[in-house]
Amino acid sequence: MVFKLFPKQDRNLDDDSSMRARSDDDGIVAEIKSAILSKIILVAGKDVKHANIHDWYIATALTLRDRIVYQWLQSDRSARSNGDKRVYYLSLEFLIGRLLTDALTNMSLMEPFRTAIEDLGINFDELRDVEPDAALGNGGLGRLAACFMESMATLAIPAQGYGIRYEHGLFRQIVSNGWQEEFPEQWLLSGNPWEFERSDVI
């Protein structure tokens, strides 16, 4: 489900309201910075000054995921308590792309996170480019499935997608000595901060 946690401020607000809005934004940015720094220490197990760009990406993704999970569970509880029917979408492929910028946009958190990251001395565009495409398929079927899921979320339709967690769902190509060579896509090589392992249900 798509949520707007921090709606854009009305441009017609009076000066006091505008100052409060800026103060709220500053508070959100400070909270995000603190959370990212905590993830660097507690998840990567590193001193902040020794963190590399991949560590910063993982910390940022997990900080955002924390905020998504609360909304996700709230939505699930609401659907269950209301007795809403839900859609279970089965597909062999789900080409969901890169989730960081997509989730930041859907949660209306792009600017606070960008500001927080750059205040910490990290280039946001470089951090964003660290994330690999999720190699969960290689064709139009996967893109269509992802679009269906996005549409249902936008329409607030309770839905769950089920597919296959491919380790090598795509391949990469290089040209070496005039010959094309293909290699499996190692998208999980450094882990996936967006997933929850459910070893108890496998």
Enumerate the predicted regions with their spans.
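A conserved ligand/cofactor-binding region detector
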Residues: 2-202
